[in-house]
Design a protein with these regions (language model features):
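Electrostatic, structured charged patches in enzyme active sites and in nucleic-acid/phosphate-binding
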Residues: 1-405
Length: 405
């Protein structure tokens, strides 16, 4: 996504209109030029890359567009790492300790570097050169990190990502959002709801799979203390929504007026005909590494119980519940498993409230011992579900023991 200073939009009354680039020859040429620059910058430093990007921007009026495209290439397609033969913090500690005993000068600095290299050569039992000490001294600073990998997108894919990011930026200042997910393939609903669960969005849900759902989401500016992190979470939902066939969205915004400096109301609307392209995979998503790890371990376990990912939606007042897994025995017995991992207190309260309202007697809750349920206002004794406690990993053995009780 894009930072606030690279978001571009215009206002049509109260309606906000994000900047969207056309896939024309000029725009694609700019995208291709930037991609080529990143490809040629591989194995160089971030600082060198940034200087080349600044030179490419020049004094042209479209510098913010170029900067936005470059930001996406940097954050989504590039991998930077500290490359140093020696540990930079250790080198600085040694060099600074010796330098403090001397009068600063170019000669003294070189002598200090040589002295540290000699000390390390003796300690490590192999030769350490002064050039290695110099190279490693500040190798961990961002500008000195090395571009070790660049997964080049096509120019078209980069422009699509830019257009999506401009629209996502609208939701940083959302106070209220309503999504109408019209009648769709049930699998699309499930994927959308799983992403909502993943991003821990505070949502009121009405409807059913036969007629569609209306989702009301509180935005980051509606919270008692506006949260940038929560605004980013809402923005991350949009690529998931694009996988739903028929939908519409309306949002109320808190916009900063650049002339008066005051905040005023704004509106934004978009639907499934918007032409935006998602970069999220259309298939199943795991809500956490906990779930993915549990699946891997279950597949290696020796048991008749079969673990299934596809679980029906459980309607409850004002929401739906999507258990993480169904466990099925050949004799017909079934249980639903919900993993309760590392969630915010308000989300924990909502989750346990959902369990109480579900009216299910076949539910297993796998609860992390790291959670402070009492502080979150949750009394687990009031929860009508079988409980499995876990620390870092959820083990199939613990779940199977509960199943056989």
């Amino acid at each position: 996504m894009l930072p606030t200073d690279l978001l571009i939009h215009r206002l049509n009354g109260e309606e906000i209109v994000p900047k969207r680039l056309l896939l024309d020859e000029n725009v694609l040429a700019i995208a291709e030029e930037l991609i080529t620059l990143f490809q040629e910058a591989k194995h160089g430093t971030r600082g060198e890359l940034n200087r080349q990007l600044q030179a490419l921007e020049g004094e042209e009026t479209d510098y913010r567009i170029k900067r936005g495209l470059a930001h996406l290439l940097n954050s989504s397609f590039s991998t930077f790492e500290t490359v140093s033969p020696l540990d930079p913090p250790m080198l600085r500690e040694r060099v600074f300790a010796l330098s403090a005993q001397k009068i600063p000068s170019a000669i003294e600095t070189q002598q200090t570097i040589d002295q540290v290299a000699d000390q390390l050569s003796q300690e490590l039992k192999h030769e350490v050169f002064p050039e290695q000490v110099k190279a490693g001294l500040y190798a961990d600073l961002p500008e000195n990190q090395i571009l070790i990998e660049f997964e080049a997108p096509t120019p078209e894919a980069l422009v699509h990502r830019y257009n999506l990011s401009q629209v996502q930026g609208v939701f940083y200042r959302a106070s209220h959002m309503v999504i109408n997910a019209h009648r769709n393939d049930p699998g699309q609903y499930k994927l959308l709801f799983r992403y909502m669960k993943l991003f821990q969005l505070m949502t009121y849900i009405e409807g059913d799979a036969d007629h569609g759902f209306t989702l009301t989401i509180d935005g980051p500016t509606s919270l008692f203390k506006p949260s940038t992190r929560y605004g980013l979470a809402i923005a991350k939902l949009l690529p998931a929504l694009l996988h739903v066939t028929r939908w519409s969205l309306a949002a109320e915004l808190q916009i900063n007026d650049s002339y008066s400096g005051k905040t005023r109301q704004g509106r934004f609307a978009i639907d499934s005909d918007c032409g935006l392209i998602s970069h999220y995979p259309p298939g199943k998503t795991y809500d956490s590494l906990l779930e993915a790890g549990f699946v891997d371990r279950w597949n290696k376990a020796k048991t008749e119980w079969r673990l299934e990912r596809e679980v029906d939606l459980i309607p409850i007042p004002g929401s739906v519940m999507i258990p993480d897994f169904r466990i099925v025995h050949p004799d017909g017995r079934t249980f639903l498993v919900e993993i309760v991992g590392y969630w915010r207190p308000e989300y924990l309260r909502k989750k346990f409230s959902q369990v109480r309202q579900s009216g299910r007697d076949d539910l297993i809750l796998a609860v992390s011992e790291r959670l402070n349920l009492e502080k979150a206002g949750v009394n687990i004794a009031d929860t009508p579900a079988r409980i499995v406690w876990f620390k870092d990993q959820l083990l199939p053995k613990a779940v199977l023991e509960v199943l056989e009780r």
